[in-house]
């Protein structure tokens, strides 16, 4: 990674203005149901505290549409952070985001203390990347630290704008994300295999196009595999397909051949007579899908084929489920990929899981710890896989 990080700064007495990603899921009572994103920011916060900084944290939470909404207050996050961070002498919260009240709260901070600003999206200027808001935020710190990989693909006042007014460096989480995903794309250990799933091919065209020039094998699953199978002239029954994407699927298959990448499609599938966990189901070859039935998972032969590819790889990136894994009878394919990734890790491969649903699948299977890297950013990891430059990363200072 060719960007400066928090290691490149002498923090003694300095105010570290840190953009974190505390956009955590809350239940109806406003309790945090998964604190992974808070935990992911702890190494950066701890390092700053240990090196004598005053730490000011900013994050968004949910979609409050540019105005204060108690439902999206960062209060529960502050309470959880206090529990997770006993080494902070104090974790304070302010109702302000910018302006005199925020500046006063920052001026009271001592080294070793943490202040959390209120939800940045309570201000309509945040998502507009308003330079005035960015300048107001910059008054609160001496150095800007971006550790919010999950929002690095969005040019907001607190992720990109503020970097124009302060020296800007990456936190450890941002560094880890860019090192793993960027490293895999630019200089992978081979064989390099990617597994791409999810419902729609249209969501992942950019990713597949970018990967075809880099990977040894691309394994396709989920609803998007149906459109590839349709492009090969197969009957998909009542399955989810995107007829308008058939020409794109044909182009991608031709491009794979041209570039010497193997593009693998399911050979058998689990089909059901309705979109329901209670539906009748059976396993058939992809050439024998009857009308009135729909594909909801990859079949056992495909699982074996894909698992063998993953186990023999040295670098694997997985983005998107293999079937409707939220319905138990159609979760086997996605689970098997998670298991094969864990086995590849045990064999010394670099295994990277990126994207919401695959992350959830790995966590449900209890295998997250077995992966080299589980990405915290859905949209951001997708854009990196597409080969795009992320605004929040571009704004950081280059390493010398």
UniProtKB/Swiss-Prot annotation:
Enzyme Commission (EC) number: 2.7.2.3
MF terms in GO: ADP binding; ATP binding; phosphoglycerate kinase activity
Pfam families: PGK
Protein name in the entry: Phosphoglycerate kinase
Residue sites binding ATP per the record: 204, 326, 355-358
Organism of this sequence: Chloroflexus aggregans (strain MD-66 / DSM 9485)
Pathway: Carbohydrate degradation; glycolysis; pyruvate from D-glyceraldehyde 3-phosphate: step 2/5
Annotated positions binding substrate: 21-23, 37, 60-63, 121, 154
Broad EC category: transferase
Organism ancestry: Bacteria, Bacillati, Chloroflexota, Chloroflexia, Chloroflexales
Self-association state and partner proteins as the record states: Monomer.
Family: Belongs to the phosphoglycerate kinase family.
Protein location: Cytoplasm
Superkingdom, taxonomy of origin: Bacteria
GO biological process terms, semicolon-separated: gluconeogenesis; glycolytic process
UniProt gene name: pgk
């Amino acid at each position: 990674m060719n960007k400066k990080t928090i290691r490149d700064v002498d923090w003694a007495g300095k105010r570290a203005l840190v953009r974190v990603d505390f956009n955590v899921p809350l239940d109806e009572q406003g309790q945090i149901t998964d604190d992974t994103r808070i935990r992911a920011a702890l190494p950066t916060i701890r390092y700053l505290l240990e090196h004598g900084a005053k730490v000011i944290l900013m994050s968004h939470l949910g979609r409050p549409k540019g105005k204060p909404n108690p439902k999206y207050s960062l209060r529960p996050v502050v309470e959880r952070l206090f529990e997770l961070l006993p080494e902070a002498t104090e974790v304070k919260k302010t109702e302000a985001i910018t302006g005199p009240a925020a500046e006063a709260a920052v001026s009271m901070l001592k080294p070793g203390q943490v202040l959390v600003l209120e939800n940045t999206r309570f201000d309509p200027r945040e998502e507009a990347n308003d330079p005035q808001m960015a300048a107001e935020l910059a008054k609160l710190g001496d150095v800007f630290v971006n550790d919010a990989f999950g929002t690095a693909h969005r040019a907001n006042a607190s992720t990109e704008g503020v970097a124009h007014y302060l020296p800007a460096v990456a936190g450890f989480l941002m560094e880890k994300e860019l090192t793993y995903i960027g490293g895999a794309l630019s200089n992978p250990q081979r064989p390099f295999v990617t597994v791409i799933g999810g419902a729609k091919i249209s969501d992942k065209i950019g990713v597949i196009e970018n990967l075809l020039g880099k990977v040894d094998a691309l394994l396709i699953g989920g609803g998007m595999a149906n459109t590839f199978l349709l492009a090969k002239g197969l009957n998909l029954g009542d399955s989810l397909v995107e007829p308008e994407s058939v020409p794109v699927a044909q182009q991608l298959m031709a491009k794979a051949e041209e570039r010497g990448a193997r593009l693998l499609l399911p050979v058998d599938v689990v089909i059901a007579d309705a979109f329901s966990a209670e539906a009748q189901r059976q396993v058939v070859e992809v050439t024998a899908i009857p009308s009135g039935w729909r594909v909801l998972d990859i079949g056992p032969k495909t699982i074996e084929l894909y698992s063998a590819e993953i186990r023999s790889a040295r670098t694997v990136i997985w983005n998107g489920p293999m079937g409707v894994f939220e319905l138990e009878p159609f979760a086997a394919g996605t689970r098997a990929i998670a298991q094969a990734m864990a086995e590849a890790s045990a064999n010394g491969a670099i295994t990277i899981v990126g994207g919401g649903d695959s992350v959830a699948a790995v966590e449900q299977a209890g295998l997250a710890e077995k992966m080299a890297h589980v990405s915290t950013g859905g949209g951001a990891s997708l854009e990196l896989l597409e080969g795009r430059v992320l605004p929040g990363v571009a704004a950081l200072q280059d390493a010398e």
